[in-house]
């Protein structure tokens, strides 16, 4: 495979030397290279190489400016129809240029230009089953995915994909989060993504059921970073993370824990052929590249919303953190505040359905809000029997087939969107629910906010009415853990570098007295979160009622 002439002579020479060095390394490791392909980014600085050894085992590496930042790493998976872990043969690859533009109502930039190179590598396993390995190279990172071809159902038994990270001159550091909290705050049965960030050394195990995506590797301080995550996950697959016990610098893909979602749902993904696995995303560069990259969105499918004029980001008053949901009268005070200060939304959180004559009360609040130029959003439990918090209601209304009826009803009232909580699992059945909610919400023009949920996986490009995800150790932990707990100033910087780098983050910022009392955060730090943390809906967590002695009115 030759590098396209558009990269110029220097890029071709560097890419050729990288491929030669990679092939020699494969030979020295005892796996004689018999086939190789190379794909370069448009600027020629970033390359991903794939080789097959004598046993038909595939591996890849990634280099930037001639420096290897992901060493020889395993590829492949085993399903009931395919075995791509050995005995694989490659056919002639095809390459195409990527040049796309799209607009986003949320995120790091509203106008996006996607330039990249894509290579499709046809494969056959030892039994003749056909598949493809699809590679992408962009200036800010690379990605790859498997495309299983054929007919009938295929269940994926294991995925061998790994990321072999080199140890830098001063020791590679790993910024990550445990997927779950063990027997502490978030048990494995409750799912994860809400634990505080941790800094580990390369190869150090994590005492939970995996490293949550995204995980950031600092190979050279201030200069060379590798961030690993996923994109374009659909109902054909499950959510994944990195195994809790790396093999030196090799970090492998891990499927969900059986206990997630209260043990309901299958761990192993199963889908009718043909189907694609999610993109395995590797952002490469300095810290600015990591923070500014939109690669997770860029790799996802284009928007399915024909007219996005109803998708309006904004600020939201929200009583749950400071005063619970309370009464309709309390929510009326929050509507008054939002109108007075020009905020676009008010979120009515859990247990609104337990009000006396709840549906009429909500409709009355909608009328009041509309008269003030404010829109309302409603909270829902995602469960269902999978939720670990069945006392938090409304319950069972976000499950098919009743979900569409519920959405049609509240859209008719004039509700602008929904917050759906307590998914508690990355299993395939929950991925189906995530996508089902987004598809149905599109039809009724409802904005969506996912809490107790998985990380952003590029869905915001495909479904731009998905305004934000939680998946962060956010401000609510001052409430849950109490004095002496909750995010520190350092953690908040880490959130911006790690979690917020892959998509909108509903941290629920700007709590004043409780953050100051808990971990000593000055008011200026809390206020800065509203700018530092990107979220399509920014839910301000402190009090916004009529009391002028506390909360935002006091400030």
Predicted regions and their residues:
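Bacterial N-terminal signal peptides
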Residues: 14-25
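Bacterial N-terminal signal peptides that target proteins for export
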Residues: 2-15
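Catalytic domains of carbohydrate-active enzymes that cleave complex glycans
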Residues: 515, 528-538
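An acidic-aromatic substrate-binding cleft motif
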Residues: 272-284, 288-345
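Aromatic- and carboxylate-enriched substrate-binding clefts and catalytic-loop regions
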Residues: 349-517, 522
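Conserved, mostly hydrophobic/aromatic
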Residues: 146, 338, 421, 448, ...
């Amino acid at each position: 495979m030759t590098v396209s002439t558009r990269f110029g002579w220097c890029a071709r020479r560097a890419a050729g030397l990288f491929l030669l060095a990679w092939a020699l390394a494969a030979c020295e490791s005892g796996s004689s290279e018999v086939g190789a392909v190379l794909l370069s980014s448009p600027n020629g600085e970033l390359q991903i190489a794939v080789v097959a050894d004598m046993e038909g085992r595939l591996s890849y590496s990634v280099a930037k400016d001639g420096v290897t930042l992901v060493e020889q790493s395993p590829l492949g998976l085993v399903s009931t129809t395919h075995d791509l872990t050995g005995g694989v043969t490659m056919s002639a690859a095809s390459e195409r240029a990527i040049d796309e533009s799209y607009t986003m109502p949320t995120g790091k930039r509203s106008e996006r230009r996607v330039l990249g190179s894509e290579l499709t590598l046809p494969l056959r396993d030892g039994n003749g089953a056909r598949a493809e390995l699809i590679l992408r190279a962009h200036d800010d990172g690379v990605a790859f995915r498997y495309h299983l071809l054929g007919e009938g159902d295929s269940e994926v038994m294991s995925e061998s994909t790994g990321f072999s990270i080199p140890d830098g001159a001063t020791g590679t550091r790993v910024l990550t989060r445990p997927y779950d909290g063990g027997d502490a705050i978030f048990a494995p049965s409750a799912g994860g993504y809400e634990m505080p960030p941790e800094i580990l050394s390369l190869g150090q195990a994590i005492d939970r059921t995996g490293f949550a995506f995204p995980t950031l590797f600092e190979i050279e301080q201030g200069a060379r970073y590798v961030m690993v995550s996923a994109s374009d996950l659909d109902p054909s697959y499950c959510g994944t993370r990195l195994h809790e016990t790396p093999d030196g610098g090799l970090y492998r893909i891990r499927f969900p824990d059986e206990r997630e979602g209260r043990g309901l749902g299958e761990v192993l993904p199963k889908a009718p052929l043909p189907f694609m696995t999610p993109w395995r995303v590797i952002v490469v560069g300095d810290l600015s590249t990591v923070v500014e990259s939109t690669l997770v969105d860029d790799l996802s499918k284009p928007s399915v919303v024909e007219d996005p004029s109803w998708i309006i980001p904004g600020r939201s008053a929200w009583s749950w953190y400071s005063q619970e949901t309370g009464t309709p009268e309390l929510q009326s005070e929050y509507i008054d505040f939002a109108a007075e200060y020009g905020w676009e939304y008010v979120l009515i959180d859990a247990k609104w359905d337990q009000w006396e004559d709840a549906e009429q009360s909500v409709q009355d609040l909608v009328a009041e809000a509309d008269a003030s130029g404010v829109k309302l959003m409603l909270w829902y439990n995602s469960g269902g029997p999978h939720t670990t918090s069945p006392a938090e209601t409304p319950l069972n209304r976000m499950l098919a087939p009743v979900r569409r009826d519920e959405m049609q009803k509240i859209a008719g009232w004039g509700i602008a969107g929904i917050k759906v909580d307590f998914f508690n699992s990355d299993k395939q059945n929950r991925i189906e629910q995530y996508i089902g909610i987004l598809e149905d919400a599109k039809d009724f023009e409802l904005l969506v906010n996912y809490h107790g949920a998985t990380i952003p996986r590029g869905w915001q490009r495909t479904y731009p009415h998905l305004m934000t995800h939680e998946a962060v150790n956010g401000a609510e932990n001052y409430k849950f853990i109490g004095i002496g707990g909750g995010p520190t100033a350092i953690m908040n910087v880490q959130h911006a570098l790690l979690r917020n780098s892959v998509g909108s983050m509903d941290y629920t910022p700007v709590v004043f007295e409780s953050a100051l009392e808990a971990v000593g955060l000055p008011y200026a730090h809390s206020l800065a979160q509203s700018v530092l943390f990107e979220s399509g809906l920014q839910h301000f967590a402190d009090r916004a009622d009529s009391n002028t002695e506390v909360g935002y009115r006091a400030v």
